[in-house]
Amino acid sequence: TLKQLIQHTSGVEWNEDYTDPQSHFARLTQCEAQPGAYACVRKIVTGLARQHPAGEQWSYSSGGAWLLGDILERATGMSLAAWLEQALWQPAGMAHDGVWHAYQQGKHDVGAHGFNATLEDWGRFGEFVARDGRLSNGKQLVPTGWFDQAASWTKALNSVSAAHPEGIYGYQWWNNAIPANAQNVQPTPQEGLKGSLWALGIYGQVIMVNRAEHLVIVQWSTWPQAEPSFNAQPLEAALMYSAIARELR
């Protein structure tokens, strides 16, 4: 289902290892460097085998995210960039143009990754989420309750752990709260931000939205690794952002 694609619980095989030149992700990016990129990627994504029953196991999949983008383009008859411009970018009054990597200009954009915007506009997007999908003039663009559902983390296998007993992933958003089993840290897990929505990109790109505190933090980074251990940089961000929130109260 679309919900399972959004939560990365489709059960379809996918290797997201950014260090493995034979991974599905590597094959996807190799396609994108060649003529006929869209057809090449679509062949990979639609040719995958099922590993687990749908909904039972969580596993991050750029292939699933790519397929969501393809579905949106087919449903709207618009490229992802054109749809985003019409549905959000212009209504929200973003200050600058965004750039979405395209396979074919105006027809097929990259669904799995490749969208770029300024730090300021990422912050504006975070403010839009903090208002539960309402524009500054009060107009509701996203269905009421969507972000509550987005923060209802999947309980599928591999999402729930001792560090994150509520689950680690929702509707394309991460739960990067201070791990429940973290020791000798300040703020403590009990003092940390609760219910935050985290967009976590490789090499340390972060948008954190906490609607209860109406706090938005955007971070750009150049971490040496695409996907570090959750005991390292993401923990550091969780602690730092919680400390900022504590000082602002």
PLM feature segments, named:
Residues 95-99, 152-216:
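Active-site Gly/Thr loop motif
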Residues 1-20:
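Short helix- or helix-capping micro-motifs
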Residues 8, 64-71, 113-135, 145-146, ...:
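Active-site-proximal alpha-helical segments within enzyme catalytic domains
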Residues 16-113:
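Catalytic-site signature segments of enzymes, centered on catalytic residues
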